[in-house]
């Protein structure tokens, strides 16, 4: 069931003084294409979704924040002047946002708050960014008269991850959550942080995630290996072309020229990243022309590259991609870092029911459990609901 304002408001009234506050929301996100491109200075292509976090907030006239997690049935009090903050991660997000906003000179005061979310956990849809963005947006409204620009609010969320959670993330998740726009995806340039909206209104198609329910343990070490491969190829190119700073600057011809200087594994991984740069730009053109068949074709190409060139897939994800292809699904690929998580699928309305039924049955026969089906609609970014 869809999370509503009433769900949060009833718990807020119940846990605090019986009066109501202001209600804010921020979404999770998907990334249509542009995977493992962020740390290579390339493009990503996210969109906000209709699943997100809803929080009710009311200043309480003290220096204390009193927070209640509806989903976890957990409560905490912390002082805004405390250097350490609460230990529970879900409350550290709120604490971190408060501290980062205070660093910007926002006169944050104590408040009561209750919050809940319906972003599926473990699906790579950035529930944490939704939580951070909700509170950054709310504190800007309540204590700064909305003087902090959206770009800075996204960076507040990123800084919270870095400084209070210990996750050295990029900016995409928070950016998509704050800047999301219904009916549009964003092409975000990870080098300049410039972005542009592109129409995404696929009439006759649905966007659906299939969560494999697996996460293979080698993900973090494999991520570092691949990042090093990219750096190795850039170093080789830089000897020939000093202006090359990342694979964003590279072409296939340049890669061919330095192949004798790098390992075959490194070259193959660089080939994927270079190709993904072009695929994102090709998807931009396809969306402007309303050509969703071409979008789907590029999604399949990305999956092939992630599986066979960048080698971040796993049997479960390749199986789901194969099922999608055999069912005539328009487009399908790994979404996220790989080694588990979800596939993102663009499927025509007339094939949707058969695809879901076939995928669930075949996956259960092969792996002993069904994938979790998550229907996705592109929605708006951070906002005040009431």
Where are these regions (language model features)?
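Gly/Ser-rich oxyanion-binding loop with an adjacent helix/lid
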Residues: 1-24, 30, 34, 39, ...
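A structural signal for short, well-ordered beta-strand segments
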Residues: 113-115, 210-212, 343
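Glycine-rich phosphate-binding loop
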Residues: 339
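C-terminal nucleotide
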Residues: 1-29, 54-87, 184-331, 346-386
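FabD-like malonyl-/acyl-CoA
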Residues: 130, 342-346
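Short, charge-rich binding segments
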Residues: 46-48, 56-59, 105
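Short Gly/aromatic-enriched secondary-structure transition segments
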Residues: 41-48, 226-227
């Amino acid at each position: 069931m869809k999370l509503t304002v009433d769900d949060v408001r009833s718990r807020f009234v119940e846990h605090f003084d019986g009066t109501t506050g202001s209600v804010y929301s921020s979404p999770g996100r998907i990334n249509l294409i542009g995977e493992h491109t962020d740390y290579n200075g390339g493009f990503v292509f996210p969109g906000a979704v209709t699943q997100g976090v809803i929080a009710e907030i009311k200043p309480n006239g003290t220096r204390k924040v009193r927070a209640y997690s509806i989903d976890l049935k957990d409560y905490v009090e912390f002082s805004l002047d405390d250097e350490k903050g609460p230990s529970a991660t879900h409350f550290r997000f709120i604490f971190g946002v408060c501290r980062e906003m205070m660093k910007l000179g926002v006169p944050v005061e104590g408040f009561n708050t209750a919050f809940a979310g319906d972003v599926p956990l473990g699906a790579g849809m950035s529930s944490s960014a939704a939580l951070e963005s909700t509170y950054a947006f709310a504190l800007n409204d309540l204590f700064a008269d909305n003087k902090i620009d959206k770009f800075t609010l996204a960076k507040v969320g990123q800084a919270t991850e870095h400084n209070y959670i210990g996750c050295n993330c990029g900016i995409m998740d928070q950016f998509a959550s704050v800047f999301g726009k219904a009916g549009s995806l964003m092409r975000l340039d990870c080098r300049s942080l410039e972005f542009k909206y592109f129409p995404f209104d696929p009439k006759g198609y649905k966007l659906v995630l299939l969560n494999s329910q697996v996460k293979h343990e080698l993900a973090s070490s494999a991520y570092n290996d691949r990042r090093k491969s990219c750096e190795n190829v850039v170093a080789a190119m830089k000897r020939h072309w000093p202006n090359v700073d990342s694979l964003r600057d590279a072409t296939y011809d340049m890669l061919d020229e330095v192949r004798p200087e790098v390992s075959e594994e490194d070259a193959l991984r660089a080939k994927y990243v270079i190709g993904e740069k072009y695929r994102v730009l090709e998807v931009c053109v396809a969306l402007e022309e309303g050509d969703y068949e071409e979008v789907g074709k590029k999604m399949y190409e990305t999956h092939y590259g992630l599986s066979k060139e960048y080698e971040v897939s796993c049997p479960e994800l390749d199986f789901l991609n194969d099922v999608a292809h055999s069912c005539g699904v328009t487009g399908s690929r790994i979404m996220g870092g790989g080694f588990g998580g979800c596939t993102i699928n663009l499927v025509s309305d007339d094939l949707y029911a058969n695809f879901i039924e076939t995928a669930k049955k075949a996956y259960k026969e092969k792996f002993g459990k069904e994938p979790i089906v998550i229907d996705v609609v592109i929605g708006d970014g951070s906002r005040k609901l009431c």
